[in-house]
Amino acid sequence: MKIMFVHQNMPGQYRELVQWLADQRAHQIYFLTQRKNPPRFDGVETRFYKTHHRPAENAYGLSKNWEESTGNGLGAARAAKQIERSEGFKPDIVVGHVGWGELTFFKQIWPDVPIIGFFEYYYSETGGPGGFDPEEPVTENTPFLLHARNAVPLANIETVDVGLSPTYWQRDRFPQSFHRKLYVCHDGIRTDQLRPD
């Protein structure tokens, strides 16, 4: 199988999965990332993308995340299409994290390729980051800014064929309408390293 992973900070949540698939020696695997000097995996071709656009420092707060995410999405999609043109690699499946917008435009380049998206978090005023981090105090704009950050997963729920969330708590933060596509699949804990004494 031809598999393309997409994550700005390779390998992200996919370290064990990528390693396991590569060890099978039965797949052609590409990993598309922005990370400089990412870890190397035998049997995995690492390729890089550059964001198409970064918002200005003083960009409008409600749209800043969307602007950055669509810049990532266009940069990743263009890089993926260039890989197909120059290297002849068109994946049978794309796997990636939706949080930074990287998967947003993959159906525009490969409408027939299934996409599995990792849905990590949906923002709301309560039970999440609002008021949690002292570095980001709650203001009268906090509810609007948190909701605006949801534009990326809202766009991507229609882009992906299947979505994964690592826990039921995370999945349940998303609107009920997402649940038809979201499956809970834990992304792993290294029990050989993280366990009670």
Language model feature labels by segment:
Residues 1-45, 164:
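N-terminal subdomain of nucleotide-sugar transferases
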Residues 11-15, 101-104, 171-172:
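Short, well-ordered alpha-helical microsegments
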Residues 31-83, 87:
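A conserved catalytic-core segment of Leloir-type glycosyltransferases
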Residues 35-44, 107-109, 173-177:
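Short loop/helix-cap segments at secondary-structure boundaries that form the rim of catalytic
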Residues 53-63, 113-151, 192-197:
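Acceptor-binding helix/loop patch of EC 2.4 sugar-transfer enzymes
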Residues 81-100, 114-116:
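Short N-terminal targeting/anchoring amphipathic segment
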Residues 87, 155-156:
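Structural alpha-helical scaffold elements that stabilize or flank donor/cofactor-binding regions
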Residues 169, 188:
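Carbohydrate-associated surface elements
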